[in-house]
Amino acid sequence: LAAATAVVMAVTGTALTSSAATGAAGEEGTSPGGRGAVDLGRQVLGADDGWGAANGGTTGGSAASAEHVSVVDTWDELRAALGGAGARTDTTPRIVYVDGRIDAFAGTSCEAIAATVPVAGSDVPFSMDDYVAAYDPATYGWVDPAGPLEDARAAAAAEQATRTLQHVGSNVTIVGLGADAQVVGASLRIRDARNVIVRNVTFSDARDCFPAWDPGDGDAGNWNSAYDNVSVWTSENVWVDHSTFDDGEHPHSSLPTVFGRPFEIHDGLLDITHGSDHVTVSYNHFSDHDKTAILGSSDSRTQDAGKHKVTYHHNRWTDVGQRAPRVRFGDVHVYNELYEQTREGIFQYYWGAGVDSSIYAENNAFELAAGVDPARIVARWKGERLFETGSTVNGEPVDLVGAYNASVGEADRLADEARWTPTLHGTVDPTWAVPAIVRSSAGAGRLGPVDAPAYDPHATYGAGDVVVHDGAVFRAQWYARGATPGAAWGPWEELATNEQGVPVWTPTRVVRAGDAVVHDGAVWVARWWSRGQEPGAASWGPFRAVG
């Protein structure tokens, strides 16, 4: 953990009004870097930043005492820092910094877990191969699995849960150090909690070693897995920000087909269920996953009515199949999202209007693969309404609810309305600017802290090397030796970002066509390559203002 002692925050410049995180008053946490750098562990959700700002706001572990501030680089350390087995009911303010790659499967494997579970009536340990052979519908029939092998699968699944599932309690902030903070193979469950912040971490591949076969799920059966990368259950005031969610080394495209169905080892990337409320999901990147982000666990949970109030904004969804999000019961604000397809792949729909839901969608950008009908963006799951405005598909305005309604019968149509009008939000950016802003800002590694050595005037640097000088972070554009970072011209580019991760314009920053930058409190998008040309300095130039 020695590297953690040299952490330098690169969060500088003017905060965007659309999502201004603020420091916790009265708490230590300003980094020694100066220049307005802020300790991400002490930041709290801005006062108007979505539903998470209601109900008293979301401050996470910002009030943590020094003894409850941890830097972790192993799965065991992370679990202990969160409170271990007692985390679910723990309310101690905590800040947990994730340093580097943490693998919940380090030192174990699916096979090793299975080997601990014998099949009743034999000395043979459980294996999924035996399970598949035993319950093949061609020989076993289309009935639920039962008997010693199913019992052993359930026991193996329970054993896995003790190893790779970790609860997160109340008043907690989990934040990644630098650009390489990653949690692999684990499922973090924020359950029965209040006031939780998760930022700047890549969550990958929360795989289920022992998915269950359900022949009655759908027309052809399905394999169902138990783990989300991050899940929010029966919790309130949660902020998930600037994180990346994916399937890691086991993307959906790599899964085999068993019994004619994908052998699904993942559930959701970020599911919010069981009456959770007042959640903001901002500047995240979701990619290469099927069932991505469901909001609400069951149509039958009528006790969830009036809850599931969630804001999604400035998130990036790349090659996801469905549920982006799918909503039950909630009043959900979805704005300035970027949906992009590099291939049609597993795509089914993006917005799912579920029972008693009310989605208010504005200024979202879609980049669909060739031949994908915009009418497929919306799907109805017993919902009655979905308000949408300002959407573009491949750069052109499209009435998405109108397109959906034109593609279905009258009984399945949606009213283009919401039962409320959002008031808790920052600036809603124009749709044309969304791709540049989101691509520049969303995902882990876009915020500090940044681990980097101090600039040495006697050292030799190559293109891409990162250093710290006078409290700022710089990257070499080409070979450098003896050239001081910060000069108006030279090899060094300053890597300042605002608190949402949007780059701050500096005279040394290289800006390329389509890049978004912040300057004088406004966001600007570059028309072409530039360096040293100040946004707004002339009536015509490389930048146009977003807001």
Where are these regions (language model features)?
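Tryptophan-rich substrate-binding surfaces of secreted polymer-degrading and adhesive proteins
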Residues: 448-547
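Low-complexity, acidic Ser/Thr/Pro-rich repeat tracts that form intrinsically disordered stalk/linker regions
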Residues: 20-38
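Secretory targeting and sorting signals
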Residues: 1-23
